[in-house]
Design a protein with these regions (language model features):
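Non-catalytic N-terminal regions of enzymes
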Residues: 1-119
Length: 119
């Protein structure tokens, strides 16, 4: 499947540089549920990795030498790349969390892969 990249999405790709990444991020902080097993977090990450990937989360950008940029479908998703686990050492502070977020968000996403990481 080939699908043109809409102008608004294309704008982000064209304006992005290593000095100025244009992707966005969201932060979610979780607490382990009461009475959850010690394997809860590991099981949660494994469940995310095992979930089926549907459009548009399996699209990656293709920029041909001639022609318009388009979305292509990634057939074999590397879920170890897309779903990861990060944490600050306990008890953890807001400052430590911000340092991790800054490090994770500093670089550009790999354009050879669908443009998302859950970490």
């Amino acid at each position: 499947m080939r699908k043109p990249i809409p102008p608004m999405d294309l704008m982000f790709f064209l304006l992005e540089s290593p000095q100025s990444p244009k992707h966005v991020a969201a932060v979610q902080v979780f607490k382990k549920p009461k009475n959850a097993p010690d394997t809860y977090l590991r099981d949660l990450v494994a469940a995310f990795k095992a979930a089926p990937v549907v459009a548009p989360f399996n699209y990656y950008p293709h920029f041909p030498r001639m022609g318009m940029p388009e979305w292509r479908v990634q057939e074999d998703m590397d879920m170890d790349y897309h779903v990861r686990h990060s944490a600050v050492p306990g008890p953890g502070s807001d400052e430590q969390l911000m340092e991790v977020i800054q490090r994770l968000h500093a670089g550009m996403l790999d354009r050879r892969r669908p443009g998302w990481i859950c970490q």
